[in-house]
């Protein structure tokens, strides 16, 4: 068990502007830090040497900076630093202390960094914008609880995501010049709206399950006067939730489905509406998709029953995966690990449920029950 618990991990790949390098977080040095690799998976170099663990990294589209989140003492009061991409001293841009801060995203020109912070002291994770030219940060949206934001290509608008309550979220269209907001996701009862991305300044894609059971991909068009239109579904499944999506070249969208706890990749052609299956993933679980600047390549954080979490690259044209990182697993022979079986069963109220069963390899005496581990997840939104 100790050897299993010590297995390393790498995740959160982010491309350089020329797509020749990828930065990511890895536990390879013991304390998680930022590492860099060229995109053929060789030449791994440790970039940061913080005393505290790094939680995430985003390479600026302008190329000059890495935005890095660091957790002092491994706690919740995460701080954000700008690390010179070509080497140099990190600059802390958040105030430190008991303030919590989360990375959101860079503007497409690399001037602004959007992040969430409770620095205002109102109890919520508000949306902030840091200007790399002036070195100043300003709050752009107030949130009572958990919140984040995504910027339009011209950085004149943003989508503000807010958690209303457990299992219930909303998105709002924010005009940064006037600070006015318009609700994008009106609904009755509970609904999850998880991810939003601007296709252009006037078109939004989002994942949501408003008026349906499973999360799907939807589109919202913004009129010339700034008024958002209705939620229009453009890709969905009756047996899987849309876990994440990423815009690709030639008007295509990469869709990552969660089908009974296993990830499945597909591609949507925005013009025709056709959805085609993507290549089979090297492992069972995928997360953290990020597209290269030319949107022909993807980084993914892949893990599985016999695979530590690693950063991979997918060439979307050829369908070829390349492993970028190599998470340590000393003393653990991955080939001997049990692969699970998908099992379905009926609950007491007749609802069909599913889960992954790991059958213990029984050696020696067969007397008595084999060893068993029960893994309970923490809420209705997640799966274990």
Regions found by a protein language model. Give the residues of each.
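Short intrinsically disordered, low-complexity coil segments enriched in acidic
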Residues: 1-4, 203, 372
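A short helix->beta-strand "capping" segment at the edge of beta-propeller domains
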Residues: 1-9, 42-44
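Conserved beta-propeller blade repeats
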Residues: 6-25, 51-70, 80, 97-116, ...
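Beta-propeller blade-edge and WD-like acidic-aromatic loop motif
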Residues: 21, 25-46, 64-65, 70-92, ...
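Short, solvent-exposed coil/turn elements at secondary-structure transition points
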Residues: 40, 50-53, 96, 133, ...
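Alpha-helix N-cap/helix-start motif
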Residues: 56, 103, 123, 366-369, ...
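Short strand->helix junction
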Residues: 73, 100, 120, 363, ...
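Serine-hydrolase catalytic core recognition
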Residues: 288-384
């Amino acid at each position: 068990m100790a050897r299993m618990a010590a297995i390393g991990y790498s995740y959160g790949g982010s491309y350089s502007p020329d797509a020749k390098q990828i930065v990511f977080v890895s536990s390879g040095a013991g304390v998680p830090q930022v590492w860099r690799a060229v995109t053929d998976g060789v030449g791994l170099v440790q970039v940061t040497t913080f005393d505290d663990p790094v939680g995430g990294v985003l390479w600026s589209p302008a190329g000059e900076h890495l935005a890095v989140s660091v957790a002092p003492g491994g706690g919740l009061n995460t701080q954000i630093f700008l690390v010179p991409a070509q080497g140099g001293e990190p600059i802390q841009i958040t105030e430190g202390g008991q303030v919590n801060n989360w990375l959101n995203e860079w503007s497409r020109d690399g001037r602004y960094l959007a992040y969430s912070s409770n620095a205002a002291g109102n109890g919520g994770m508000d949306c902030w914008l840091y200007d790399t030219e002036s070195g100043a940060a300003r709050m752009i949206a107030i949130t009572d609880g958990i919140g984040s934001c995504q910027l339009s290509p011209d950085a004149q608008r943003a989508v503000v995501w807010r958690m209303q309550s457990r299992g219930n979220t909303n998105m709002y269209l924010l005009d940064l010049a006037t600070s006015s907001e318009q609700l994008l996701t009106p609904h009755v009862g509970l609904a999850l709206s998880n991810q939003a991305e601007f296709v252009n300044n006037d078109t939004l894609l989002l994942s949501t399950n408003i008026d349906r059971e499973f999360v799907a991909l939807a589109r919202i068009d913004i009129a010339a006067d700034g008024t958002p239109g209705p939620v229009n579904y453009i890709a969905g499944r009756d047996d899987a939730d849309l876990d994440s999506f990423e815009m690709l070249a030639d008007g295509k969208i990469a869709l990552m489905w969660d089908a009974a706890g296993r990830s499945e990749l597909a591609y949507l052609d925005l013009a025709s509406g056709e959805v085609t299956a993507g290549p089979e993933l090297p492992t069972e679980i995928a997360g953290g998709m990020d597209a290269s600047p030319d949107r022909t390549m993807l980084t993914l954080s892949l893990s599985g029953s016999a695979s530590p979490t690693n950063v991979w690259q997918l060439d979307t044209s050829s369908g070829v995966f390349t492993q970028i990182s190599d998470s340590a697993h000393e003393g653990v022979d991955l080939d001997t690990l049990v692969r699970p079986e998908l099992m379905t069963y009926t609950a007491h109220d007749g609802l069909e449920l599913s889960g992954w069963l790991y059958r213990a390899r029984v050696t020696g005496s067969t007397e008595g029950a084999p060893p068993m581990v029960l893994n309970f997840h923490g809420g209705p939104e997640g799966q274990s």
